Design a protein with these regions (language model features):
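Rossmann-like dinucleotide/phosphate-binding beta-alpha-beta segment
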Residues: 1-82
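Rossmann-like dinucleotide-binding domain for NAD(H)/NADP(H)
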Residues: 83-132
Length: 132
């Protein structure tokens, strides 16, 4: 999914910083870029901390497991830019939803887009109270 997102964003010449637990070799990135007609100068593998601190948009593409449950929590959110956009189309449970609601309440320029939640169907969720 992350690679598809890169392909979709490439015509816009976006600077794409990504974090992956796997360290990609430069030739792997080069081959991916050549195959998909993407300028390799726009793609950078960085530490998770650097991605959080530097990015305008955080798009989450992770499996849900013991290591990733509530991975995006208050501590992680505190590293984001005040105007950060958070997109979660991966799995509910990766983002600590109450922590995100608190972050959004205190950062008027930020927003979040989700198509997954920890508990579905969604009956009562503090994130819905933030819709404006």
């Amino acid at each position: 999914i992350g690679q598809t997102l890169v392909q979709l964003l490439s015509p816009f010449q976006c600077k794409i910083n990504f974090f992956d637990v796997r360290n990609f070799q430069i030739d792997e990135l080069d081959n991916f870029c050549l195959k998909n007609h993407i300028d390799i100068k726009n793609i950078n593998q960085k530490s998770m901390n650097d991605v959080l601190v530097e990015s305008d948009i955080i798009s989450i593409h992770l499996p849900l497991n013991d290591e990733t449950e509530d991975m995006i929590n208050a501590e992680v959110l505190s590293k984001l830019k005040p105007s950060a956009v958070i997109v979660n189309t991966a799995r509910g449970g990766i983002v600590a939803e109450e922590d995100l609601a608190n972050f959004l309440r205190t950062h008027d320029d930020s927003f979040a887009a989700f198509d997954v939640f920890k508990e579905e169907p969604v009956i009562n969720n503090n994130l819905f109270n933030l819709i404006s």
